[in-house]
Amino acid sequence: MYKLMNGVEIPSIAFGTWKISDENICRKSVKYALECGYRHIDAARIYNNEIFVGKGISEFLKENPNIKREDLFITTKVWNSDQGYEETLKAFEASLERLNLDYIDLYLIHWPNTKNMATTFETWKALEKLYNDKKLGLLEFVTLRNIILKN
């Protein structure tokens, strides 16, 4: 486990779901990963499998009542075409719905919009709003990924 700056702990190894596009395989893989002890599941809207990931999580939790949602760490990402302030807020809500979760632990900007950094900044503002609106309890942590120094 790694302790993040806000005190949230993140499991050091995640089960990634990139390229698992078949519903049955994705759902079963996520469930099996959790059965094997993974507690961090990594998803993204662009992978087109958040619904299947959510089903795997839901089935696992249903069959393992001693493990609660808060014992898991779920990551997903906002894609380039969903960047911008309002767009990111809508994309987040859509991911929550597809995953069938009450909250997401970590929401990332999958790739910065290097052709229009203003869009990336607006996206970041939306992530800050989601994070700072604690009464909603929708998001535990935000960060960037795939950022190169020149960005």
Residue ranges and their predicted role:
Residues 1-72, 102, 122-126, 132:
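N-terminal binding-site loop/beta-alpha segment at the start of enzyme catalytic domains
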Residues 83-151:
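Glycine/proline-rich, positively charged
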Residues 14-18, 42-44, 75-77, 107-110, ...:
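A cross-family glycoside hydrolase active-site/sugar-binding cleft signature
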Residues 11-24, 76-87, 116-118:
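Active-site mouth loops of central-metabolism enzymes
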